[in-house]
């Protein structure tokens, strides 16, 4: 009832002045206020309603301060900056009745802020989320980067299609890696998602949508990515590389197997392979062979290595990482 009252009260005061909904519920007792961010911006008027049948003796405070901001069942505030955001609490006689946390979402020059996540710039600028799938099972992993280490939370939602969404279940985002980049530390977060009713052999007609809600202190931002599974396929490297010297020859036969994680049957979900011979020095010329088979014949020079990687045979998605074996 509290949330419904809050939204209705806010509409009655603000909707005539603005055609856009500038406050919305992120989750229980947490609301996002959308602000145009420029000097002397008027901000947004927000009406908070205490979730109680009581009518009298109610006071309001912000965060840990004991300063009384107002009294009565409702509190009207003008939200202009981060100092106006935070947790508003209504009390009566020393008892907490309810609270509402206000977060801010900034828009500057018509563009929503993207301060929390780092632009990965691959495959293009303004790429904040990257996703990969090892096969066509409907399972995929997404990850993002930030230089922020504390007071940070993420939540992830996903669906296939937006007009009639089909279910995709995502787990909790977790910190998966830390790296040092010059004077800064970089943190990688990732999430695993699974399409609920995936059909690996079916042609995709609707893209998968991934939405990440990011909150740092009192700042809210959201990031989205849209893709077909076929576009984010990256197989695991081939496994079980073996060399077989050929009699009276400098050549060897290198063989390998499909990765265990690749979709089956392999006669339908086929891979193509790149075989590379690399000398000890990276400046030496690389010899490469492309094949649809799981073996190839190459010249194996002393101190060289042979590497093999895989790609979907029928769709030009990403190559796998290399699997390698030394020539001697």
Curated annotation (Swiss-Prot):
Q: Which cysteines are joined by disulfide bonds?
A: 50-90, 131-142, 170-193, 300-327
Q: Enumerate the spans annotated as Ig-like C2-type domain.
A: 23-106
One short Pfam name that applies is: IL12p40_C
Q: GO terms for molecular function, please?
A: cytokine activity; cytokine receptor activity; identical protein binding; interleukin-12 alpha subunit binding; interleukin-12 receptor binding; protein heterodimerization activity; protein-containing complex binding
Q: Which GO terms describe its cellular component?
A: cell surface; cytosol; endoplasmic reticulum lumen; extracellular region; extracellular space; interleukin-12 complex; interleukin-23 complex; late endosome lumen
Which family does the record claim for this protein?
Answer: Belongs to the IL-12B family.
Describe its assembly.
Answer: Heterodimer with IL12A; disulfide-linked. The heterodimer is known as interleukin IL-12. Heterodimer with IL23A; disulfide-linked. The heterodimer is known as interleukin IL-23. Also secreted as a monomer. Interacts with NBR1; this interaction promotes IL-12 secretion.
**What name has this protein been given in UniProt?**
Interleukin-12 subunit beta
Q: Which organism is it from?
A: Homo sapiens (Human)
State the organism's lineage. Eukaryota, Metazoa, Chordata, Craniata, Vertebrata
